A protein has these predicted regions:
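Conserved long hydrophobic alpha-helices within structured protein cores
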Residues: 101-102, 250-254, 330, 440-452
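Gram-negative/organellar outer-membrane beta-barrel architecture
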Residues: 31-36, 63, 75, 118-126, ...
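C-terminal outer-membrane beta-barrel translocator/porin domains of Gram-negative envelope proteins
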Residues: 368-485
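Short regulatory "switch" loops immediately downstream of catalytic or recognition motifs
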Residues: 101-114, 257-271, 275, 337-340, ...
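Short acidic, glycine/proline-enriched loop segments that cap or flank alpha-helices
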Residues: 50-53, 318, 416, 438
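Periplasmic polypeptide-binding modules associated with outer-membrane biogenesis and secretion
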Residues: 1-201, 205-206, 220-240, 355-358, ...
Length: 485
């Protein structure tokens, strides 16, 4: 302030020290930072006179905390107010999501075609947006968005996802997330040759579309024909029922298969073959109707005639074909993770429930019903011990109906679903078959398995196991232990 003096007017400057810091407050209250972080950052300044230069350094520390926790748009400014009792108020502008837009791009990354019209994607926009956990009105978090992008890639529907953050005009701190989606081909026709223990050498043709009607539905037709049978299977899968917060999936299939059971391939070196007919009259031996080496010293045209004339003797009509099982049926399966209604929460537990219905018929290669089989090497002098005759179906029926309810649960803590090196995988399932009529058996089947992976670094054969200086190591190795029952 000016003061009159003997030499003229003097300017007196009155210096008032900053108050002693007692507390630092961030505004607004919903600032996403934990109180302990604020305490740890400013605790060394409490009880000391406010120094604005040091305050700026502390604000940069807060800025780094926000950035390291994914809030890359957050800005800390101030102080906006310093009270006489030492309360310092800082302002935090985190960055708020105003909305999420989906744009479809071509392979060149353009969102319009030659006619300057927007690219129309096959996928429904809600299939994309439902994988995005950041909602309008929530703070923008880079880490959260990266997880959302990984989920989009996990659908296997998109070859590229480009992210653009567009500021909202007239609304500072608000941004719109623009997702540029490049779709990949989801329809396929494939074929090949292979070998399996159940089918032997086989050929396979598969026709599928994993984005049916743009709703992420998967429809697949698989036809396999092999050395020991064939299979036709039509499967429909909805990986996430629309509108379900539990992320419930649905799968159904219908199938027709004909294959030689593994037990018939391996037992007696695959020597179990078919009988056209068989009549058990509780005798010690069963005799072939095609030979005279029997109590009647005569051949017969059919088993019924032989049984009528010699009712105390068991008879069989030998055919000699391999025995296959024809299965016609379908199933319905629902599964969901135990996420408590949060579709974006990663949880180890998943449960499954399903229904299965199928008709099973033992047949020869011509498709004729063959409920009886015989070990060929046990036939001596055109007869066989009666106890050696095999029922190839339940109760030796021409057809069995199998109806079951299936319940299962899995626990998965693997670090990588495709190439795990650590973690555990446990599964438990039970399938209860119930009788729904004649020749429909009742029984239960229980299966369980446990696998444990231990990471190791024993071999250095792969190039990724011998990285040069500055290169990342890529050397996944593990020991796996598995128990099944």
């Amino acid at each position: 302030e000016p003061v009159n003096g003997p030499l003229g007017v003097q300017l007196a400057v009155q210096v008032v020290p900053n108050p002693v810091i007692t507390q630092v407050v961030l505004e607004p209250e919903d600032n996403k930072i934990e109180p302990q972080v604020i305490e740890d950052t400013f605790s060394s300044d409490y009880g000391r006179t406010l120094n604005l230069n040091e305050l700026q350094l502390r604000m940069k520390e807060l800025q780094r905390w926000y950035s390291s926790n994914g809030y890359s748009l957050a800005r800390v400014s101030g102080p906006t107010r310093v009270s006489p009792d030492g309360v310092v108020q800082l302002k935090v502008l985190i960055g708020t999501v105003a909305g999420v837009e989906v744009k479809f791009l071509n392979k060149e990354g353009e969102d319009t075609n030659e006619k300057e019209e927007p690219i129309k994607g096959k996928t429904k926009p809600w299939v994309v947006s439902r994988e995005i956990s950041i909602k309008p009105g929530e703070p923008f978090n880079r880490t959260q968005l990266e997880s959302d992008i990984r989920r989009l890639y996990g659908t296997s529907l998109f070859s590229d996802v480009k992210v653009t953050l567009r500021p909202v005009t007239g609304e500072p701190g608000f941004i719109t997330i623009v997702l540029g989606i490049v779709e990949q081909s989801t329809g396929s026709l494939s074929g090949g040759l292979g070998y399996s223990q159940s089918q032997g050498v086989f050929g396979q043709v598969q026709l599928s579309d994993s984005n049916l009607f743009g709703r992420a539905w998967d429809l697949a037709l698989n036809i396999t024909y092999g050395q020991f049978g064939g299979l036709a299977n039509l499967t429909f899968t909805d990986p996430w029922i629309k509108g379900d917060n539990h992320r419930t999936s649905f799968r159904t299939s219908v199938f027709l298969s004909r294959e030689v059971p593994q037990v018939f391939q391996s037992q007696n070196d695959g020597d179990i073959v078919s009988l056209r007919d068989y009549e058990d009259n509780n005798s010690k031996y069963a005799y072939s109707i095609d030979s005279k080496k029997n109590p009647a010293d005569s051949r017969f045209n059919n088993v019924s005639k032989a049984g009528n004339e010699f009712p105390e003797t068991s008879w069989f009509d030998y055919e000699g074909d391999s025995i296959a099982l024809e299965r016609v049926g379908g199933n319905i399966i629902f599964s969901r993770p135990l996420n408590g209604g949060d579709p974006f929460k990663k949880v180890p537990w998943q449960v499954l429930a399903g229904l299965n219905l199928q008709a099973v018929r033992p047949i020869n290669y011509a498709g004729g019903t063959r409920p009886y089989g015989i070990p060929r090497d046990k036939i001596k002098n055109d007869r066989i011990e009666n106890d050696e005759i095999i029922c190839t179906s339940f109760d030796c029926a021409d057809r069995n109906t199998l109806a079951s309810v299936r319940l299962a649960a899995t626990y998965n803590t693997l670090n990588d679903g495709r190439n795990p090196t650590s973690g555990n995988f446990f599964s438990f399932g039970t399938e209860q078959y119930v009788s729904i009529g004649e020749n429909s058996p009742t029984f239960n089947r229980v299966r369980t398995s446990y696998t444990h992976f231990i990471p190791v670094k024993w071999l250095k054969l792969a190039k990724g196991c011998r990285p040069k200086e500055g290169e990342p190591e890529n050397c996944p190795q593990a020991l796996a232990f598995q128990i099944k029952a």
